[in-house]
Amino acid sequence: RHTIPLNNVVAENYEAVFFVGGKGAMFDFPENKAIQAIVRNYYQSNEVIGAVCHGPEALVNVTLDNGHALLEDKAVSGFTNEEELLLIPEAESIFPFLLQDKMIAKGARFNSGIMYLDKMSHDKNLITGQNPWSVWSVAETVIKQLGHEPKHREITAEENAVDILIAYHQQGSQKAKELIEKKLNDKEKSIDRLLIAKHSIIAAMKGDVSGFFNIIGLVSFVKKMELKA
């Protein structure tokens, strides 16, 4: 009840704007004139703009004063077609457009990472992330871009799981297991086994049978190492 309507926001009172995602952003953000004005003014004033998952929908229809699309020749990330269509095969008929397609159509250099894992792009004062598992890196990069050092914090169990899954996809099961052991040797660290297990389901949905069993093996290995610890 205390949310300020965008039309009433005095953008000059803030140093940064951060757009989070959710499917509703696909309908609410692209045509919102208040959002377009804030983003255009922030970008041209070199203020910091962060957006993650479907949050970059806020950027797709912004035109700068020079007549060029904001996204033209910008390195960006956002929820990918592959991620969208795996979860919602009929997404193209439900949503006005797919975010990846729209960003590319606006001239963006779209950077995609592994499905449902951390991927961030940083282009001057524009910081974007692919999905909800990019939120930590995007948020901390926004803080650094503002000229501050993020406060020390404990790395979450979810982040540790993301690191392990990235290691698996990029370097294989053995490297992922080595990383599991390394993380669990630090008694303060925990690993979100459920998140890793969910990626076995993603592998199955993609028809990747070996990936399914490999990731299930990682879940079992985490449990085994936790019991040893």
Describe the residue ranges of each PLM region.
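Active-site-adjacent pocket-lining segments in enzyme domains
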Residues: 1-50, 54-229
